[in-house]
Every structure is written in C-alpha cells, then in structure tokens.
Design a protein with these regions (language model features):
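Receiver (REC) domain switch/active-site residues of two-component response regulators
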Residues: 170
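A conserved, positively charged/aromatic
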Residues: 165-166
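Short, glycine-rich nucleotide/cofactor-binding loops
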Residues: 43-49
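Conserved N-terminal subdomain of the carbohydrate kinase-like
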Residues: 32-41, 53, 57-151
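Acidic, Ala/Val/Gly-enriched low-complexity intrinsically disordered segments
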Residues: 2, 7, 15-17
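Charged helix-capping and loop-helix junction motifs
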Residues: 154-161
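Conserved small/polar residues in nucleotide/adenosyl-binding loops
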Residues: 178-183
Length: 185
C-alpha cells in the first residue's frame, strides 16, 4: 500500500499560499504563516486511533501540515464479540457543513485526503464539495466497506466511488485488494 506520507509532501509542496486568520479554542486568533499548508481529511472516525481521521491528523502533523477534518462515519469495535465492527454514517448535511466550515475558517485548503465514506449518499456529498471548491489536490485512499456494513451496500458504494470520485483524484493510495478491484482484474 502506498502510504500517505510518501504521497503528500510533493503534492503540497507546489501550492502557493497566503496567511489567514483562524479562531482557536480559546477565542483568540492565531496566524498560520504563509508556508503552512492546510489539508482536509474527509474520513471516518475509529476509536483505536490506528486508522481514519485520527491517523490522518497525526500524519499531517508529522509532515508539518495543519490538518482539519470532516467526519463521514463512526466505526466502533466490540471487544467482547470477536472485535466486530459497528458502522454509523454521519448525516450528509453535517458532512457538507463540516467541509464548508473548514474552508470558511481557513480561507483555503491546499489538499484533501479522502478516506472511508461508506455510503453512496456520502460519496455524492463529497463529490459536490470537490466540484464546488475545486481543491488544488485530491488524494483518494478508498475504503469500500468495513466489517459491520451490509455486504450488498458495497457494490453501490464501489460504483459511486468509481463514478464520482475516482476521476477527480490526483493521487490514489489503495491497498492491493482495492487496486485489483479498481483495475477490474
């Protein structure tokens, strides 16, 4: 699997940015300098911290990139039931509002990294945002289905991902299974 750290620096390194004010949790304003890049992770949340938006933010931080998120779903695990997964999608309007807020607060987003979306409706909302905001760089790390989702939904999700997001991606970082699937092998 191609990892995000190897993909992001060259992509973000070619974007010219300007300083912007943004609010902090203390109600003060902080200033991002003109060289700090901003990346938006559109992804699911996963409690272990080993995947999803949490890991994207850690990766951005390690690369010196300021990260913000739009959560698409919440995935939980049941340690008492063979670590079974529970998938809960975030309301599409909330996803839209999160993306809109990230852009409005920072005035720009230099790159978008898309992870687990989980439903065709969510994919549609993200595709609309990509069209509306014309983000300079789009990294797609497709997660077609997780344990706990209905297997029948995987085909609709896969088709929506191929149709609406794959053509808009500058970089795709799938695992081998998804690479074979995307290549129709």
């Amino acid at each position: 699997m191609v990892t995000l750290p190897s993909a992001i620096p060259p992509i973000l390194g070619h974007v010219v940015v300007t300083p912007r004010q943004f609010p902090t949790s203390l109600g003060r304003s902080s200033r991002l300098d003109s060289v700090t890049k901003i990346a938006l992770a559109i992804a699911g949340s996963e409690a272990s911290g080993g995947a999803g938006a949490q890991t994207d933010l850690k990766t951005f931080h390690q690369l010196g990139v300021f990260g913000c998120t739009s959560l698409t779903c919440i995935v939980s695990f049941d340690p008492h039931n063979d670590w079974g997964h529970r998938f809960v999608p975030v309301d599409p309007q909330v996803i839209h509002d999160q993306i809109e807020a990230a852009v409005a607060v920072h005035g720009r987003v230099d790159a978008v990294k898309i992870g687990m979306l989980g439903t065709p409706t969510t994919i549609g909302v993200v595709a609309e945002a990509l069209e509306s905001y014309q983000f300079p760089r789009v990294i797609l790390d497709p997660v077609l289905i997780c344990k706990g989702q209905e297997p029948g939904a995987a085909l609709d999700t896969d088709n929506a991902l191929r149709e609406k997001l794959l053509p808009r991606a500058d970089v795709i970082t799938p695992c081998l299974l998804y690479t074979s699937d995307a290549a129709d092998e």
